[in-house]
């Protein structure tokens, strides 16, 4: 099976540095998994993911779960309850969300046994600006993994690549609506950007989060090439990547904080007073990691806020049915 993710080719290689950023800590996301601890130079769970470290990996190490060996899959399932979610299940749950939003069934496709038949007619809305409200409607995929509910470049259970017209992710549906209701590149990009600003997801494990971010980036390139027959400009890519990095973030879903507390400084300039006196016993570092609440961005209000504050009272994000199915209320 061919690689589904390649860190060394367009558009990932040109944007990898930005894709590794953590908007809360202003550093990089961390690995938050022990699966790489057996490498020549062991990688700790708290290690920041950097371009330098990733360049030392083989091309098959940062790949979706379906391409990992059985031992790795079992280890990740045991450690973090990571599982496959087939596309037909994602489609079923996303259809349920859309049925609630539209007030009718089978808006984008008709479900079949472990599959679906795409409805090719233009999606209808009750009002002239109804499509804009749909694009702006906020959705959150909790513990998103590779983000199969948001975008469906491939079936997470089989690795099969899906054609654009067969895709069933939340964002895929919004991009279809944008395609059907815009007539020029300027308007199209404006509403594609808003579609990206409307979908959110968080994940604990850094490698899965990176894959999710890459999936959203490649999805943008796919739709641009399909609609306009060109690749995005650097400026367009920067805008999309900035939204992706804000909206797909690393978090411990139970505490609402970054995994393992505040990250340690990568470098410290020593002074005379940093050296331990010969006969003085070295103090043990017994301090608990400082909790840092994760920040997200409300694009319509143009401000950042903590996920915790949003969850406790601000109705900024509609938590979709797939997230409740996965054990989160």
Predicted regions and their residues:
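Intrinsically disordered, low-complexity, charge-dense segments enriched in Lys/Arg
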Residues: 246, 260-262, 272
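Conserved S-adenosyl-L-methionine
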Residues: 92, 101-257
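Basic, amphipathic N-terminal segments
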Residues: 265-291, 296-297, 304
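Preference for the N-terminal adenyl/adenosyl cofactor-binding alpha/beta module
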Residues: 1-151, 207, 254
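C-terminal tail/extension regions appended to the core domain(s) of diverse proteins
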Residues: 293, 301-304, 308-316
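Intrinsic-disorder/low-complexity loop/linker signature
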Residues: 26, 159, 175, 180, ...
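Residue-level detector of conserved catalytic or cofactor/ligand-binding positions
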Residues: 314-328
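Short linear, low-complexity motifs centered on an aromatic residue
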Residues: 107-108, 262-268
């Amino acid at each position: 099976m061919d690689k589904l993710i390649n860190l060394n080719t367009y558009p990932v290689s040109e944007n990898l540095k930005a894709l590794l950023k953590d908007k809360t800590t202003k550093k990089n996301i961390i690995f938050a998994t022990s699966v790489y601890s057996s490498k020549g130079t062991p990688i700790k769970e708290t290690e920041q993911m950097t371009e330098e470290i990733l360049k030392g990996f083989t091309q098959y190490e940062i790949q979706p779960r379906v391409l990992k060996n059985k031992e790795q899959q079992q280890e990740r399932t045991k450690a973090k309850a990571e599982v496959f979610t087939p596309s037909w299940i994602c489609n079923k749950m996303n259809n349920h969300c859309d049925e609630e939003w539209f007030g009718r069934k089978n808006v984008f496709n008709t479900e079949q046994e472990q599959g679906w038949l795409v409805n090719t007619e233009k999606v209808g809305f009750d009002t002239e600006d109804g499509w804009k409200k749909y694009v702006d409607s906020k959705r959150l995929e909790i513990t998103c993994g590779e983000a199969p509910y948001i975008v469906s470049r491939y079936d997470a259970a089989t690795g099969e690549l899906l054609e654009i017209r067969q895709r069933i992710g939340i964002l895929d549906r919004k991009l279809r609506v944008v395609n059907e209701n815009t007539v020029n590149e300027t308007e199209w990009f404006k509403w594609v950007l808003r579609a990206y600003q409307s979908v959110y997801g968080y994940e604990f494990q850094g490698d899965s989060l990176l894959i999710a971010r890459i999936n959203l980036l490649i999805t943008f390139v796919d739709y641009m090439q399909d609609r306009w027959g060109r690749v995005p400009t650097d400026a367009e890519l920067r805008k999309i990547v900035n939204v992706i990095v804000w909206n797909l973030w690393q978090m411990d879903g139970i505490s609402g904080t970054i995994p393992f507390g505040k990250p340690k400084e990568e470098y410290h300039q020593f002074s005379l007073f940093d050296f331990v006196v010969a006969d003085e016993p070295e103090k043990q570092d017994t301090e608990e990691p400082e909790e840092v609440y994760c920040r997200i961005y409300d694009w319509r209000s143009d401000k950042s806020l903590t996920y915790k504050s949003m969850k406790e009272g601000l109705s900024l994000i509609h938590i979709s049915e797939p997230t409740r199915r996965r054990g989160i209320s």
